[in-house]
Amino acid sequence: SVMEQRDKILEEYYAQMGIAKPVYDFCMKVEEELKDRFLSIDKTAECNQMKVLRAMQKNHLSEACFAPTTGYGYNDIGRETLEKIYADVFGTEDALVRPQITCGTHALALALMSQLRPGDELLSPVGKPYDTLEEVIGIRPSNGSLAEYGISYRQVDLLPDGEFDWDGIEKALNEKTKLVTIQRSKGYASRPT
């Protein structure tokens, strides 16, 4: 059969590359054992690909979306369409997809600065934020930080077992608390994720 010929050719190619027959056979055995996992991953990828393709069709992605713009950001049909596609794919109300948003810290800074105003307070009930957010918040002094704009910060550390300190959180909440940030990633801290 065609598949048997393909397998024989593959085995020969591996042998020519110096892969010993026992190693090759072991790899084939492991691949066979993982076949169901690989199939599951492939199905997830296929589902996600279809989700993206459906969103592209729904939002009428076309060659016009790839045309150059004036550079001022007005009437950029490509950007507007791309953001609608992202919102549909991720099931969100809206999306910002810009090359100017360079990293996760940048995205979080934009979110915090868009929601907090002078006199407001940001609460972190999971302890200290990721290192790069310290300057954004103003834990470490920085020009343009939330603290510089009169936004205070309070944190409640997790309990030694990694659970929320519910009593501490209740005490920390006050009339100034406008936003609570829960960071799952531990960053460089030794706490559990």
Please name every model-derived segment:
Residues 5-26, 52-53, 65, 74, ...:
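Conserved PLP-enzyme active-site core in the AAT-like
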